[in-house]
Each structure stands twice: as structure tokens, then as C-alpha cells.
Amino acid sequence: MSTRDLVLTALFAAIIVALGLLPPISLGFIPVPITAQSLGVMMAGVVLGARRGAIAVLIVLLLVAIGLPVLSGGRGGLAIFASPTAGFLVGWIFGAFVTGYLSERLVNHGQSGLVQTVSFFLAAMIGGIVVLYAFGITYLATVAGLGFTKAFVGSMAFIPGDVIKAVVAALLGRAVMVGYPLLPARA
């Protein structure tokens, strides 16, 4: 990994942590709060690509594991990984990877701005919502004893906000691609 890669992954880890400074919004009927940090996960995948995006998320989760209060609401420590929300945290890694993987394959410099933006949006939707929810809902249903259907239905309240986050990530991805393309070169 080059110095540039290290700096970029550390930068996006810091962005994800900074998004955690925004207070979480609890819905009350499901133990998972609405946070801005999933936007950081989508942005890491869209801007950095699969490998670097996943590494940025891993850095954040390592900071959580050693006890730093870097999650929304000032949460941190190993106990977080035993909570009902742990599946979403693990899903961050795979969500960033899939978002980045799809971004690397769907977006190229020869496309129009609209096609690039839509491609980034699709990548963020699939990686940052579908993949993330697959991990989070499955773990939540198992650990909280809600059952898959109840966990799934309860999680649907987060979809509108996550779609907005995917739009923001797509617009950011397009802006970065125009000004300073960071996505790894395709083979």
C-alpha cells in the first residue's frame, strides 16, 4: 500500500468518525439509531474503491474495538460488537467493499456526468443499503430475538434516509471524479 493509499484511507476513516459527531436519532421501535456514519461508508466505497474503502472502515472499527468513542453518540468498546447493532457495523466493511467494487466497474472517465452519477448511486444503493442491511438485519433478528420479518420491517424506516445518503455519496463521487479521480485504474 502506497503512502497515498494510507493517507486516503486514514482521511476517510476520519470522515466516518467525524460523521459520528452528529447525534444519533433513535426511532424507539428498533434498537438501531439513524446515524450519518453510513454515509461515510458509502462515500469511502464510491471515492476510494473497494479495497481502500473497506480498509478505511476497518480502521474505524479498530478504533471502536480499542474503546475510542468514535461511533455516533460517543459509543465505543468491544461491547458494541455484542449489541444488536453489531451486524450493521460488520456490514459496513462489506458495504464499503461492494460499493467500491461496483463503482470501479460501473464508472469510467469516458461516460457522461449523468451516467457516472447514476452509476455511483446504484453502487451506493447496492453496497451501502442492500449489503449493509443483509448483515445488519440478519444479526439484529438473531441477537434481539425479533425474528427476521419484524427486524426487516422495522429497518424499512431507515430506507428513505439511506437513499438520500446514497444520492449525496453519488454526487460526491462524481465531483471527486471530475476534480481529482481517486478510483483505482481498471485492469
UniProtKB/Swiss-Prot annotation:
Changes seen on gene knockout: Mutant exhibits lower biotin uptake and has a diminished capacity to form nodules on bean plants.
Molecular function in Gene Ontology: biotin transmembrane transporter activity
Topological category with respect to the lipid bilayer: Multi-pass membrane protein
Gene3D superfamilies reported for this sequence: 1.10.1760.20
Assigned keywords, A-Z: Cell inner membrane, Cell membrane, Membrane, Transmembrane, Transmembrane helix, Transport
GO cellular component, one term: plasma membrane
Subcellular location: Cell inner membrane
InterPro entries: BioY (IPR003784)
Transmembrane feature ranges: 10-30, 53-73, 78-98, 120-140, 152-172
Induction and repression of expression: Expression is repressed by biotin.
Keyword ATP-binding: no
Quaternary structure, from the entry: Part of a biotin transporter complex composed of BioM, BioN and BioY.
Family: Belongs to the BioY family.
Function: Involved in biotin uptake.
Name listed for the protein in its UniProt record: Biotin transporter BioY
Source species: Rhizobium etli (strain ATCC 51251 / DSM 11541 / JCM 21823 / NBRC 15573 / CFN 42)
